[in-house]
């Protein structure tokens, strides 16, 4: 019975990672501005998660000090997603997701600073290898430089909010803090759109197919994927989760090629550079797991 539950959780994790990969494809298929897309995503996802908490009859009250921190993290999430979708729209899904493998490199730099731990030599070495993989991609895909830079900035901000969340997640329920973060990000983007005078009739006048894609993005790819991933992480080891989530760029790039088509076809050096980055990230996880296993 326990073996069946493990297999079910493992397959569910792959499904969640598949959904995360599909998020990038939706970003390319939804034909509205990046900030507008994030506004819809955070607003609807926040409502769905809030409804889920009400259904569970769970309190959402938090200390004011924690709320202030969550609001700041929510701003970071909004900025992260805005530049994620901006990168997709000025380049493509393949470029954007390949850059997201740089997350572990940024984490190896930022984590020692935020958590005040020593820098590990092999993380620096792997970071240099990842930069080499990135250099190969940039040499042959220089026409996508703007998208590469947007994606790298998005990854950097994403690592920042993940590390901050790493501290908050131990203090409060993960779904509750996400609701606060989503609505804070929604408010932040709302202010930006108001200042930029984007809220007009055309903003809400979208074709039915676009509304459908937005709802899929907010419900399945955001609210559901988040709550399901939290449940899965309770049953699987962090190592298994980490290795599996590294497949997100692979799933996303394959989905983009089959759904969007030739625009997602890249040169051979791009795939070589992407494989170097992905393999290094996975090797980093394997070594970390072995070192952790040797600790008393």
Regions found by a protein language model. Name each.
Residues 32-79, 104-107, 157-164, 179-197, ...:
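Transmembrane alpha-helices of multi-pass small-molecule transport proteins
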Residues 40, 97-102, 165-186, 222-258:
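Helix-helix packing/entry segments at the starts of transmembrane helices
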Residues 42, 210, 246-296:
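C-terminal-most transmembrane helix of multi-pass membrane proteins
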Residues 53-56, 103-125, 250-271:
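C-terminal transmembrane-helix exit sites in multi-pass transporters
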Residues 56-94, 100, 136, 218-236:
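Specific transmembrane alpha-helical segments of multi-pass solute transporters/efflux pumps
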Residues 49, 71, 119-138, 189, ...:
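Hydrophobic transmembrane alpha-helices of multi-pass small-molecule transport proteins
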Residues 1-39, 75, 79, 83, ...:
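Glycine-/small-residue-enriched transmembrane alpha-helix faces in small-molecule transporters
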Residues 17, 25-28, 49, 107-108, ...:
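Transmembrane alpha-helical segments that form core, pore/gating elements
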């Amino acid at each position: 019975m326990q073996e069946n539950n493990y297999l079910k959780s493992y397959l569910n994790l792959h499904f969640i990672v598949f959904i995360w990969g599909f998020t990038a494809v939706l970003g390319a298929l939804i034909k509205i501005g990046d900030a507008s897309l994030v506004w819809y995503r955070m607003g609807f996802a926040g409502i769905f998660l809030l409804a889920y908490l009400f259904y569970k009859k769970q309190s959402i009250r938090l200390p004011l000090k924690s709320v202030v921190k969550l609001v700041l993290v929510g701003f970071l999430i909004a900025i992260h997603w805005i530049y994620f979708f901006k990168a997709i729209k000025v380049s493509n899904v393949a470029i954007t997701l390949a850059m997201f493998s740089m997350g572990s490199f940024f984490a190896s730099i930022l984590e020692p600073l935020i958590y005040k731990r020593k820098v590990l030599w092999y993380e620096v070495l792997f970071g240099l290898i990842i930069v080499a993989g990135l250099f190969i991609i940039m040499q042959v895909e220089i026409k996508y430089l703007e998208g590469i830079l947007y994606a790298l900035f998005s990854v950097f901000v994403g690592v920042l909010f993940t590390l901050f969340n790493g501290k908050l997640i131990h203090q409060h329920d993960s779904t509750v803090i996400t609701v606060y973060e989503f609505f804070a990000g929604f408010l932040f983007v709302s202010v930006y759109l108001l200042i930029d005078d984007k809220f007009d009739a055309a903003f809400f006048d979208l074709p039915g197919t676009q509304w459908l894609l937005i709802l899929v993005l907010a419900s399945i790819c955001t609210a559901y994927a988040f709550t399901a991933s939290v449940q899965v992480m309770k049953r699987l080891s962090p190592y298994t989760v980490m290795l599996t989530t590294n497949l997100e760029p692979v799933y996303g790039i394959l989905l983009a090629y089959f759904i969007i088509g030739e625009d997602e076809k890249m040169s051979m050096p791009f795939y070589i550079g992407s494989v170097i980055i992905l393999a290094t990230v996975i090797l980093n996880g394997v070594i970390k797991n072995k070192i952790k296993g040797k600790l008393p």
